[in-house]
Amino acid sequence: EAVKAQERYLNRFMLHKNAFTGIMMKDDPNLIAIEISNEPHHRGTGVEVTSFVSRLVGAVKKSGFKNPVLYNITHSVQLMDDYFKAGINGGTFQWYPTGLGYHKELQGNFLPNVDQYEIPFDPVIRKNKGAKIVYEFDAADINRNYIYPAMARSFRAAGIQIATHFSYDPMFLAFANTEYNTHYMNLAYTPGKALSLMICKEIFHSVPLYKNYGNYPENSNFDHFSVSYENDLATLNLPEKYFYTN
């Protein structure tokens, strides 16, 4: 009965009509994909997990949704093949290379922490032609400007197609981030970090998937981008476009 309830919820969620736009979720052009489960820890057998995930995928697709249906595959990784047997179109990932909730600013050079984004089970994903999307990432508790572009570089080297940052702070609480005080991101209060995140967008638009620039410190300069711990600096330098975080 619990699985039936989840199927019903997902199907009706996709058929929900936005009261402001009049568009159903399944038809919303801004909905590029849907993740049907976040960070699951499955205790069942592979066959049971495939059956469960398949039912949820089916409930979404039954609505008429045409875009990819994704599943968080970074937990219970021993079930990787079973996830794809269920008909998912790809996996979702996260990255917190400096941990979470240190309660004060971390000190030191963390570029070695983001040298590579390793996906040990990547052959399974590529065999199934699965999409790879990072739904949340941050170098938490680091109030510096240099690190985000290095993360974006490593994401692209790992074949990540889309990445979304966690999280942008609303202006009224950005001075202290009382919502979740391990992340700090706001254009007014952390302008250098905000510019650094803008550079990440440029990296995702220009760096090819799976392009590898080697290891730190040689990969601190790549294409038109550079990062420097010593200068707390990230840059994009093109004739028509120049971003400088400091």
Regions found by a protein language model. Give the residues of each.
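Active-site mouth of glycoside hydrolases
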Residues: 1-88
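Active-site beta-loop-alpha junctions enriched in small/polar residues
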Residues: 36-39, 74-76, 96, 137-138, ...
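Short, solvent-exposed loop/turn and secondary-structure capping segments
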Residues: 45-48, 101-106, 145
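Well-ordered, non-membrane alpha-helical segments in soluble/globular domains
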Residues: 50-55, 109-119, 145-150
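Glycoside hydrolase catalytic-domain groove-lining segments
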Residues: 69-70, 80-141
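Substrate-binding cleft of secreted/luminal carbohydrate-active enzymes
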Residues: 141-223, 230-233
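Extended non-globular C-terminal regions
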Residues: 234-246
